[in-house]
């Protein structure tokens, strides 16, 4: 909210609000998670001021609710995100993503020789948390990559 207490992004009556997305990540989430493949109204706030983060992105999707699996898959991109469930303009549920064991149908394998590029199969990566990184192992080529490599792909 600004100092004059006006919302910078219009409130929604019913749906999902993904808040505290790192700045410059909002569009990537919309694309990767195919959030725009809906007839519902989507409101996007980019580079909004944030007391905690400095700047943040925000996504509001009317009449759409994310599954727990979808929420947890956000953890790679926006580990500090808050996913709010809205009903009649009130927050009726709030959750934070936690790193899942597997991410399906979202990422693309960076190995150009992986069979997933030539065959009509859904991507699938096992998630392994390490001391300073998160590793993703492709189900098909069984190669392991730093999550930064996969996310940049």
From Swiss-Prot:
SUPFAM superfamilies: Aspartate carbamoyltransferase, Regulatory-chain, C-terminal domain (SSF57825), Aspartate carbamoyltransferase, Regulatory-chain, N-terminal domain (SSF54893). GO terms for biological process: 'de novo' pyrimidine nucleobase biosynthetic process; pyrimidine nucleotide biosynthetic process. Keywords: Metal-binding, Pyrimidine biosynthesis, Zinc. Signal peptide: none annotated. The keyword Metal-binding applies. Its cofactor is Zn(2+). GO terms for cellular component: aspartate carbamoyltransferase complex. Zn(2+) binds at residues 109, 114, 138, 141. Pfam families: PyrI, PyrI_C. NCBIfam families: ATCase_reg. Involved in allosteric regulation of aspartate carbamoyltransferase. PANTHER family: ASPARTATE CARBAMOYLTRANSFERASE REGULATORY CHAIN (PTHR35805:SF1). Contains catalytic and regulatory chains. Belongs to the PyrI family. This is Aspartate carbamoyltransferase regulatory chain. It comes from Salmonella paratyphi A (strain AKU_12601).
């Amino acid at each position: 909210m600004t100092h004059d207490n006006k919302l910078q992004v219009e409130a929604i009556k019913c749906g999902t609000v993904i808040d505290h997305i790192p700045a410059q990540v909002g569009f990537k989430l919309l694309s990767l998670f195919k959030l725009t493949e809906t007839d519902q109204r989507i409101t996007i706030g980019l580079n909004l001021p944030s007391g905690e983060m400095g700047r943040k992105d925000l996504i509001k999707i009317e009449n759409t609710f994310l599954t727990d699996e979808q929420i947890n898959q956000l953890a790679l991109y926006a580990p500090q995100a808050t996913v709010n469930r809205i009903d009649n303009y009130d927050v009726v549920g709030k959750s934070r993503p936690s790193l899942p064991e597997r991410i399906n149908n979202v990422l693309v394998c960076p190995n150009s020789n992986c069979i997933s590029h030539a065959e009509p199969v859904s991507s699938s990566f096992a998630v392994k948390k390490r001391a300073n990184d998160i590793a993703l192992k492709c189900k098909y080529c069984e190669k392991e990559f730093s999550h930064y490599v996969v996310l940049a792909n």
